[in-house]
């Protein structure tokens, strides 16, 4: 199970980097748009938290109702949440999600230099 979890995480990290190659598939754009709507630091933080909540925990019992498959969101939200689900106390997931939503986010994903080559390599790797 641990090996399968690591393979899944590795694949998702590659997908995160691949999606970073296009601005429409980046959490960074969503967060910047939200923050730029505020005029004070408090407003900017609140708008960022609301924007992140919309694409993560919003929807109540309909888990991941408004989910997005964006670079940054995969690496910094979905992967840690998956790891928490499989390796730690599942009861702490909601608490962790709320902490992620209310904490300022910054991009730490570096896109591939050649996304086409990376995509082909990723296809080859997953077909093994």
Predicted regions and their residues:
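Catalytic domains of carbohydrate-active enzymes that cleave complex glycans
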Residues: 1-128
């Amino acid at each position: 199970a641990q090996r399968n979890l690591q393979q899944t995480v590795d694949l998702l990290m590659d997908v995160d980097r691949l999606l970073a190659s296009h601005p429409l598939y980046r959490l960074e754009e969503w967060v910047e748009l939200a923050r730029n709507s505020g005029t004070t630091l408090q407003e900017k933080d609140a708008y960022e938290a609301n924007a992140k909540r919309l694409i993560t925990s919003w929807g109540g019992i309909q888990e991941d109702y408004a989910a997005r498959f964006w670079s940054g969101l995969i690496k910094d939200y979905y992967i840690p949440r998956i790891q928490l689900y499989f390796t730690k106390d599942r009861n702490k997931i909601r608490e962790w999600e709320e902490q992620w939503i209310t904490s300022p986010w910054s991009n730490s994903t570096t896109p591939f230099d050649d996304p086409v080559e990376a995509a082909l390599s990723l296809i080859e790797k997953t077909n093994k």
